[in-house]
From Swiss-Prot:
Compartments where found: Cell inner membrane
Membrane topology listed for this record: Peripheral membrane protein
UniProt entry keywords in alphabetical sequence: ATP synthesis, Cell inner membrane, Cell membrane, CF(1), Hydrogen ion transport, Ion transport, Membrane, Transport
Protein name as catalogued: ATP synthase subunit delta
InterPro entries: ATP_synth_OSCP/delta_N_sf, ATPase_OSCP/d_CS, ATPase_OSCP/dsu
Recorded name of the encoding gene: atpH
GO cellular component: plasma membrane; proton-transporting ATP synthase complex
Keyword Cell division on entry: no
NCBIfam families in the record: ATP_synt_delta, PRK05758.2-2
């Protein structure tokens, strides 16, 4: 996974810079998200792995998956990826693009696992507290995991903050066991 991200990073950075220059970050974000879904499809993976197809043909077939004619810049980007045998990296490129966009917009996407459903008021208080602490606009996604017993687990990117009762019990058990 880290290797794929390393390979995808220069492409994501280049396309993000180009999108900024064109004032088209939102359009590129949407196009890359769709392209990432297409690239993740098993049939498409099989086509991309077919050694009997030229890289140009693979890019053309890939472009045909879009409902509308592609802007020339996106078509050229797909062709560059195809020529470098990197079309399969589109999910990673899209994810990195979204991280660059979030950084630009000073926003962060957090996933919160809780032991019980949070009310709208509790969610808003959590968003306000995290926004103040992180100095960013917070987009919150919550899931319920009753095995946590209580507390929360906060995830964003590579950062995980485990403030759950289950996590605290596990840390105590490790400390007592050593």
């Amino acid at each position: 996974m880290a290797e794929l991200t390393t390979l995808a990073r220069p492409y994501a950075k280049a396309v993000f810079d180009a999108a900024q220059d064109q004032n088209a970050v939102d359009q590129w974000d949407q196009a890359l998200a769709f392209a990432a879904q297409v690239a993740a499809d098993q049939e498409v993976k099989n086509i991309l792995a077919n050694p009997g197809l030229s890289e140009q043909r693979k890019a053309e077939l890939f472009a045909e998956c879009f409902e509308e004619p592609l802007p020339e810049a996106l078509r050229n980007f797909l062709l560059i990826l195809a020529e470098n045998k990197r079309l399969a990296l589109l999910p990673e490129i899209s994810a990195l693009f979204r991280l660059y966009r979030a950084d630009l917009e000073k926003s962060v996407h957090l996933t919160i696992d809780t032991a019980f459903d949070l009310s709208a008021d509790e969610q808003q208080k959590l968003i306000d507290a995290l926004s103040k602490k992180l100095e960013r606009k917070v987009e919150l996604e919550t899931t319920v995991d009753q095995s946590l017993i209580g507390g929360v687990i906060v995830r964003t990117g590579d950062l995980v903050i485990d403030a759950s009762v289950r996590g605290k019990l596990a840390r105590m058990a490790r400390a007592l066991g050593s």
